[in-house]
Amino acid sequence: LRMSRGLGDVYKRQGSDNEYLPHNYDKNCVVYTGTHDNDTTVGFLQNMPEKDKKFAKKYLGHKNDKKLCFEIIRAALSSCADTAIIPMQDYLELDSSARINTPSTLGCNWKWRMDKNALDPKLAKKIYKMAKLYARV
């Protein structure tokens, strides 16, 4: 049905199963680092089992935890996927406190708002350069 309607697969960049690694994506797919229903990438990394984090660092070629979030973004943008979606919380490198929704829970869901000053010119330029480099603009 997806293919008959011209819709591709959807891949989430959280996890280390081989099927979900960027080098295995089909062109006709959507890759994203997160949605409203899962943790931010930084929050995900903070809670990731050490062996999975070690694999992610090796796969992405970085040993520094601080750079890992942006390397995951880079992997998504540089993939062959037709569409890449990166939540602002990931560009801003925010932790779990910026999560939008935790399914099946009551309370603080849907409360996060981006501060109007959060996207400074330096970050905007970094986002634009990566998007341009990987032909996403």
Named regions from a protein language model:
Residues 36, 110:
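Conserved, mostly hydrophobic/aromatic
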